[in-house]
Amino acid sequence: DNILYSSEVLHENQYISYGPYEFIMQHDCNLVLYESGNPTWASNTGGLALHCRATLQTDGNLVVQNSANRIIWQSNTGTGTNGDYLLVLQKNGNVVIVGPPIWATGTGR
């Protein structure tokens, strides 16, 4: 799957992927985007803590937290408004956070 939904968590060694891309919460607490096994982006939090997890919060902020729930890195994208946010690993290797729809038919079941 290439999507992380609001409140979903990537624990150690869990990832989302799309084609040659993998966005993984490593065991060393570094959140890294790989293309074909080569790192292309990182949170640079490797070695700062143990047993970390990455969470997409309900306000749209992506955070890396240690086992004591302390935030050691964040995307600083919190909107102050809770909603249905998605972190998407796109087919071009870009990782984006998108927010609630601004219009819908209201026919979803």
Swiss-Prot record:
One of its GO terms (molecular function) is D-mannose binding. CDD domains: B_lectin. Residues 1-109 form the Bulb-type lectin domain. GO terms for biological process: response to other organism. It comes from the Eukaryota. Its main location: secreted. Residues 79-82 form a propeptide. Disulfide bonds join C29-C52. Homotrimer or homotetramer. This is Mannose-specific lectin.
